[in-house]
Every structure is written in C-alpha cells, then in structure tokens.
Amino acid sequence: MISNFDCTDNQASSKVLRPPGGGSSDIFGSEMPQTPRNVKNRMASNIFAAEKDNGVKNNVRQGAHRFYFIGDAPRRGQKTVDSHNRLFGEPARPITPGKNHMKSSIPFGQNTEAVASAQKLLTTNGHYNGKSGSVSSASSSVSSSTENLKMNSGSRSVFRNMSTAAGPDTKETSQRESLCPPSPVPIEVPTPPADSLPIDNSCRDSEVGDVPADNSTYTKSDQVNEACQTRRDSGNNPELPYSLDQMAGVANVKEPLGLCPNEVKEDAQACSKLDSRNPITGLGLNGDGVGGLKPKKLKIREGNPVTGEGYKAGGNDFHHRQESNNGGTPVINKNRIPPGGYSSGLW
C-alpha cells in the first residue's frame, strides 16, 4: 500500500481549471470585443460626401423575412441578406446629377448641336443617388446658374436693342403712309345670274299701293277690318261674343252699403276661454275634452303632499284614526299615507 502512494499529490498540479463555457465566457468577466457602433451624424451634409462601399439603404421593408434587392439593408440588429453583392459585388450605377431648373434651354449665339448634347447630359429625372460625380454635378449646377444669369441679362439687352432698333422703321413707315396714301381697292358687287329667283336678290324696301275696292278684308294699306279682329277673353256681345266693335256698355256697379259677411269680426272672447292647455294631460280644455284629450280635472294642491297635512277630508280619505270608546289602545286604520305622498299618480 505504501508503494502505491503517489508522492506528487502534495505538489501543485499543472492542470488549469477552465470555467464552464470556455475562457471567453461573460460570466467570469472577460472583456467584450470592442466593435464600433454605426452612429449616424444627421447634422452632417452629404452633398460633397465620398463614396460609400455599401449600397443605398432602404429601411422601409420591415423584418428579415422580406425580400432584399440590390442596395437594400435590413433593420438594425439583423444581418444583411444581399445575395447580389455576395456573388457579383457592388453593382455599378450610372451617374445621375441633379437637374438645374434655373438654367435656360434657349441657346443665344452658341452652337446648337453642342448645346443639345449638353442638355441631354444634364437632363435627368431630377434624382441623385449619392454616388461618384456629386462634386462635379454640384459645381456644374453652380456654374450653370451663373451662366443662366449672364445669358438672361444678355438676352434682355439683345431684346432691348432690337426694340430700340425697330423704332425708327415704324416712324419712317408712318411718314411714308401719310405722304403716299394707299389706293383704295375697288369693291366689286356680285351680279346675280339670269335664272335667279326674286328671293335670291338682296332685301329692299317695297312700297304697298292702294288696295282694290273689291277687297273687303283690307280697307287701307296695312290695316285690317276691326270686325275680323276678335279676342275671346274680352267680348261680351251675345250676337258677336268675340267682337270688339259691338260691345255692351259698362255695367252700373255700385259699392255695397254694408261690409261683406266675411269681414264681420267676432266679439272678443272671454279670458276664461283662452286659457293655455297642456296637450298631454288635457289641462286647459275647460272639462270638455275636445280632440279626444283627457278632460280637465281639478286638483286641490293645498297642504303637504308627503305628510298629507292640510288636505280636506273627502270620500276617499282614510287617514283618520278610529279611537275606541272602551278606554283601550286606539285602533289605527292601516290606510295611512301612501308611498310617495298624496301627489303620487298611484293614488
């Protein structure tokens, strides 16, 4: 047993104990790998920015399960899934500089073909993808704006010179016209053909002569006999009911001595008949019940409606006590104050 005793048990062991999960486990305070965070500086200008290796980000699509196309990037914390960049690399995009809306497209004294080619290069869809050529596009826009100002000022001066140069010509033409007036152009009257009808000729005033005596309808020119003129709503002659020349005389209409029956005013009614009424309860109808409403029912409203004090004793009142004559306890009638008082609609 002594020979089996290991003398090396008292010495320090060369084995190093490792924590569960490995030496890089966060449980035992290992240092985290320092990875730079992608912090955006939103105040920085990207007009003259340099090229970026990654594509234009598009964070509109949400979730990693969506399809990602060229230049798309997932939301924060997710891995970029771009198979095109992984297989073929970054795609080459064409340069699309911003469109200069202030530059005039009218050429003044320049080569038309060169201007057209320059306009083709500068005429884009108005978008800039942030790729190469941003500095040149910005500088070209600034230079083109200054050229536009120069061209506009030059065009104004050209137009002003043209307007001033055209002034003396107009004066000379006016003086020339006053000295030598133009000869009038003779107006030819069209002659109608020989086979034309009278209706084809131009209109002219024609005079009407005397009417023959055998014409009984017309006595004079443009005058018709009064006997032939009728009016249905004004004639009152029984023989010629629609004649205007044989009308009866005006009827002798006199004013009536008294007032018309419909204008006789009734006597003033008494105030008791003009009481206001309630269409629900029928109060104010004087007990006649006109219109099928409930007739007026007089109610005595003196006294306290809760305790019943002050009401007059009637045939339906049972609130009086009956005292016994034998000297015992008085018998109290159970018909006491109704619940809700005497003004309740239940009683």
UniProtKB/Swiss-Prot annotation:
The modification Phosphothreonine is found at T35, T96. One of its GO terms (cellular component) is microtubule associated complex. It comes from the Eukaryota. Pfam families: JUPITER. The modification Phosphoserine is found at S24, S105, S134, S145. Residues 181-193 have a biased composition (Pro residues). This is Microtubule-associated protein Jupiter. Keywords: Cytoplasm, Cytoskeleton, Microtubule, Nucleus, Phosphoprotein. Belongs to the MAP Jupiter family. Residues 132-145 have a biased composition (Low complexity). It comes from Drosophila yakuba. Residues 1-33, 127-193, 303-347 are annotated as: Disordered. Its main location: nucleus. Binds to all microtubule populations. Residues 1-14, 146-164 have a biased composition (Polar residues).
